[in-house]
A protein has these predicted regions:
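Metal-associated gating/positioning segment near the N- to mid-region
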Residues: 1-42
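Short, acidic/polar
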Residues: 2-9, 57-69
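Divalent metal-coordination and catalytic microenvironments
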Residues: 12, 48, 77, 106, ...
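Short, surface-exposed connector motifs at secondary-structure boundaries
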Residues: 16-21, 46-49, 72-76, 147-156, ...
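A glycine-rich helix N-cap at a beta->alpha junction
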Residues: 41-54
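Histidine/acidic residue-rich metal-binding segments in metalloenzymes
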Residues: 61-227
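C-terminal cap of metal-dependent C-N hydrolases
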Residues: 242-245, 298-344
Length: 344
């Protein structure tokens, strides 16, 4: 069966997450106040932050009612995983109904990506995947940075930067908007996966080793604000389709902290505090929410054992009932959340 909000909360809790940001892509698209209000009735100690749709249906043709969505509980406004027309963005920014609420836009031009599956490189050609040119990120990024110059008071966030060129452009930008990076892009690249790995099927497209190194460096230097999970769970009916036609995305909240710890702490020499800044405090900043704090008698804590070994498989306890598009199946993982105060 497919994922629902309750199974999502359960998975996030057992993986140590106390907050979830949910994008407006749903059925129906979350561009009406009713869809915000109905989700706000869910009782959970995991804090749910709902993004409202920037445009109706995520189609980028007509603005949604920004004021109504934000007044009724939307944490901010986001569109689909590609850039809407600049004119509709200008229209929304000029109206300024979002005030200080965050706006999340993906610097991705799907017309330039076409059917590209992996960022254009030698490894992409060797794997036999259709290439995704770097211009599919760079050209919309140029547009968004130019727009941000004219509307610097807008709390703009760039959804999931994925290329070395993108990091370089942000580093050199006079005015820097906040930006996220997908966790999977920090732990894998298109030189490290087998041709049959489900981890190829992500948006934005997986890049090269140089892209991955630049993303890690960009995070460390605070060019990038936060790490996103961007979980997109699917069941067997979708997961078993050929990679070039299946729905893009992977799931696996339980993998995020162990694999990031391995890559950023063990291999890249980060301090634990830096990792926490990028997976907790940075996301709070982007969402315009208060940072998590450890307090006496609080249940908002987790215990993580970086040496705990376990086997990643779809039979893994607490993670077997829904999504089947988890990567790295049947492999040993080092590091595990062994307890969380939010687990009932």
């Amino acid at each position: 069966k497919e994922e629902n909000i309750y199974s999502l909360i359960k998975k996030a809790t057992f993986a140590g997450y106390g907050q979830l940001g949910i994008l407006p892509r749903s059925t129906p698209w979350r561009d009406q106040i009713e869809s915000i209000i109905s989700m706000k009735t869910i009782k959970s100690e995991v804090l749910i932050h709902l993004w409202g749709g920037f445009s109706l249906g995520g189609k980028g043709t007509t603005l949604s009612k920004h004021t109504d969505l934000l007044r009724n509980g939307a944490v901010g406004l986001a569109d689909d995983d590609f850039i809407p027309p600049i004119e509709i963005l200008k229209q929304g920014f000029l109206l300024g109904e979002m005030k200080k609420s965050p706006i999340l836009i993906a610097p991705r031009d799907k017309s330039l990506q076409i059917e590209g599956m992996s960022r254009q490189s030698v490894d992409t050609l060797r794997a036999g995947w259709p290439p995704d040119p770097v211009e599919s990120e760079i050209l919309p990024l140029i547009q968004l940075l130019e727009l941000y110059k004219h509307y610097p008071r807008i709390s703009l966030g760039l959804m999931n930067i994925s290329t070395a060129q993108g990091v370089s452009m942000l580093k050199d930008a006079y005015s820097k908007p906040m930006a996220t990076v997908l966790w999977w892009h920090l732990v894998n690249d298109n030189s490290s996966l087998s041709p049959f790995d489900i981890g190829w099927s992500v948006t934005p497209s997986l890049g090269s080793q140089n892209d991955r190194d630049s993303l890690i460096k960009g995070l460390e230097d605070n060019v990038l604000t936060a790490i996103s999970v961007h979980s997109t769970p699917t069941d067997d009916s979708e997961t078993n389709r050929p990679a070039n036609i299946r729905k893009k995305g992977i799931s696996g909240y339980n993998l995020v902290l162990p694999l990031l710890w391995d890559q950023l702490i063990r291999k890249s020499g980060w301090k634990v505090e830096k990792l926490w800044e990028k997976i907790s405090f940075g996301p709070s900043q982007l969402l315009n929410q208060a940072e998590e704090k450890l307090r006496l008698e609080s249940n908002r804590w987790l215990l993580f054992d970086p040496e705990k070994e376990w086997l990643q498989s779809k039979e893994e306890k607490h993670f077997s009932s829904t999504a089947t598009n988890q990567p790295i199946k049947d492999k040993k993982i080092c590091g595990k959340v062994i307890d969380c105060g939010l687990i009932n």
